[in-house]
Amino acid sequence: MAIMRKTHPLLKIINHSFIDLPTPCNISSWWNFGSLLGICLIIQILTGLFLAMHYTSDTATAFSSVTHICRDVNYGWLIRYLHANGASMFFICLFIHVGRGIYYGSYMLSETWNIGIVLLLTTMATAFVGYVLPWGQMSFWGATVITNLLSAIPYIGTTLVEWIWGGFSVDKATLTRFFAFHFILPFIITAFVLVHLLFLHETGSGNPSGLNSDSDKIPFHPYYTIKDLLGVILLLMVLMILVLFFPDVLGDPDNYTPANPLNTPAHIKPEWYFLFAYAILRSXPNKLGGVLALILSILVLATFPLLNSSKQHGLVYRPITQALYWIFIANLLILTWIGGQPVEYPFTTVGQVASXLYFAIIVILMPIANMIENDILKL
């Protein structure tokens, strides 16, 4: 008799994705972050659903409804902080996942990589509209500043901004539509995740050696299910330490002040996971230039498969590109720090140098290093 999981139409899909999936036997813990992102997405959707049951998307009551969730709803404080800090964990896993993809040459699976970039952009959009919902000072002014950037688009800019706002400023209509977007986008992300997995399972995973692993594969279950479970336990442990001991460490104190259009906070800045992009945005002295730099800071990831000329897969045996990679990571951390600093000397200058280096490493230095390493191989 045939095994049900191999014949049943629904179970067959799960079986081919999580049980009998042929997996390289040498993939390291850096490959755990895909499953951790799946767990983060599930946590965010579940906590978000319970928050939406008590939240009101109206400027008069939004701030009070969040306070009500924390004070009066059973375990409301836990759900709220799980959702807020879950977003931070989501982005930590995302950045590591992308970093792993760059280091081990996963971008050569171009369909999977491109869907991944779409996923990154959609997740960033979701987090941005979500940050507006508590209707604190930073929510309001963050929404005002970032949506206002669209006015830099020639000819249609001003009309576009007013259309997104639903009026002449960030107000009731803006909050309502942002709530609608924040509710629907995670389900769109889930659909993209399935496409991401579909493309990945067409080619199979890469592995740390960068060599073809077709001759040496093992089933995903039980080895990798247990390995992923360990990752999940560690992720939940870090998340719970954040939520129960340091719930506000990654937030902004200004967001505990209700939104006031007449009073601007001293330093308007987004959540920590957007600071690198915010620093790049602020580095260009021209408004439109800044907006383009902001968009390109993510879209530049799409150039990796195009600019790669290396004979080797991944950076394991490529010392020059490896050095550039770690300089790139350090530079990203500098940009994150600069994004949270006031706009004054020397921060502006450091930000401009770091922004230029961010693009230079990806578009100029890494392709040159590829060619040098190819020449060294011929010696």
Curated annotation (Swiss-Prot):
<dbReference type="InterPro" id="IPR027387">
    <property type="entry name" value="Cytb/b6-like_sf"/>
</dbReference>
<keyword id="KW-0408">Iron</keyword>
<dbReference type="InterPro" id="IPR048260">
    <property type="entry name" value="Cytochrome_b_C_euk/bac"/>
</dbReference>
<feature type="transmembrane region" description="Helical">
    <location>
        <begin position="288"/>
        <end position="308"/>
    </location>
</feature>
<feature type="transmembrane region" description="Helical">
    <location>
        <begin position="226"/>
        <end position="246"/>
    </location>
</feature>
<dbReference type="InterPro" id="IPR036150">
    <property type="entry name" value="Cyt_b/b6_C_sf"/>
</dbReference>
<keyword id="KW-0679">Respiratory chain</keyword>
<dbReference type="Pfam" id="PF00033">
    <property type="entry name" value="Cytochrome_B"/>
</dbReference>
<dbReference type="InterPro" id="IPR005797">
    <property type="entry name" value="Cyt_b/b6_N"/>
</dbReference>
<keyword id="KW-0813">Transport</keyword>
<feature type="binding site">
    <location>
        <position position="201"/>
    </location>
    <ligand>
        <name>a ubiquinone</name>
    </ligand>
</feature>
<dbReference type="GO" id="GO:0045275">
    <property type="term" value="C:respiratory chain complex III"/>
</dbReference>
<feature type="binding site" description="axial binding residue">
    <location>
        <position position="83"/>
    </location>
    <ligand>
        <name>heme b b562</name>
    </ligand>
</feature>
<comment type="similarity">
    <text>Belongs to the cytochrome b family.</text>
</comment>
<keyword id="KW-0249">Electron transport</keyword>
<keyword id="KW-0812">Transmembrane</keyword>
<dbReference type="Pfam" id="PF00032">
    <property type="entry name" value="Cytochrom_B_C"/>
</dbReference>
<comment type="subunit">
    <text>The cytochrome bc1 complex contains 11 subunits: 3 respiratory subunits (MT-CYB, CYC1 and UQCRFS1), 2 core proteins (UQCRC1 and UQCRC2) and 6 low-molecular weight proteins (UQCRH/QCR6, UQCRB/QCR7, UQCRQ/QCR8, UQCR10/QCR9, UQCR11/QCR10 and a cleavage product of UQCRFS1). This cytochrome bc1 complex then forms a dimer.</text>
</comment>
<feature type="transmembrane region" description="Helical">
    <location>
        <begin position="320"/>
        <end position="340"/>
    </location>
</feature>
<protein>
    <recommendedName>
        <fullName>Cytochrome b</fullName>
    </recommendedName>
</protein>
<feature type="binding site" description="axial binding residue">
    <location>
        <position position="97"/>
    </location>
    <ligand>
        <name>heme b b566</name>
    </ligand>
</feature>
<comment type="function">
    <text>Component of the ubiquinol-cytochrome c reductase complex (complex III or cytochrome b-c1 complex) that is part of the mitochondrial respiratory chain. The b-c1 complex mediates electron transfer from ubiquinol to cytochrome c. Contributes to the generation of a proton gradient across the mitochondrial membrane that is then used for ATP synthesis.</text>
</comment>
<keyword id="KW-0479">Metal-binding</keyword>
<feature type="binding site" description="axial binding residue">
    <location>
        <position position="182"/>
    </location>
    <ligand>
        <name>heme b b562</name>
    </ligand>
</feature>
<feature type="transmembrane region" description="Helical">
    <location>
        <begin position="178"/>
        <end position="198"/>
    </location>
</feature>
<dbReference type="GO" id="GO:0008121">
    <property type="term" value="F:ubiquinol-cytochrome-c reductase activity"/>
</dbReference>
<feature type="transmembrane region" description="Helical">
    <location>
        <begin position="113"/>
        <end position="133"/>
    </location>
</feature>
<keyword id="KW-0830">Ubiquinone</keyword>
<feature type="binding site" description="axial binding residue">
    <location>
        <position position="196"/>
    </location>
    <ligand>
        <name>heme b b566</name>
    </ligand>
</feature>
<dbReference type="InterPro" id="IPR030689">
    <property type="entry name" value="Cytochrome_b"/>
</dbReference>
<keyword id="KW-0999">Mitochondrion inner membrane</keyword>
<dbReference type="GO" id="GO:0006122">
    <property type="term" value="P:mitochondrial electron transport, ubiquinol to cytochrome c"/>
</dbReference>
<keyword id="KW-0496">Mitochondrion</keyword>
<feature type="transmembrane region" description="Helical">
    <location>
        <begin position="77"/>
        <end position="98"/>
    </location>
</feature>
<keyword id="KW-0472">Membrane</keyword>
<dbReference type="GO" id="GO:0005743">
    <property type="term" value="C:mitochondrial inner membrane"/>
</dbReference>
<keyword id="KW-1133">Transmembrane helix</keyword>
<feature type="transmembrane region" description="Helical">
    <location>
        <begin position="33"/>
        <end position="53"/>
    </location>
</feature>
<dbReference type="InterPro" id="IPR048259">
    <property type="entry name" value="Cytochrome_b_N_euk/bac"/>
</dbReference>
<dbReference type="InterPro" id="IPR016174">
    <property type="entry name" value="Di-haem_cyt_TM"/>
</dbReference>
<dbReference type="GO" id="GO:0046872">
    <property type="term" value="F:metal ion binding"/>
</dbReference>
<dbReference type="InterPro" id="IPR005798">
    <property type="entry name" value="Cyt_b/b6_C"/>
</dbReference>
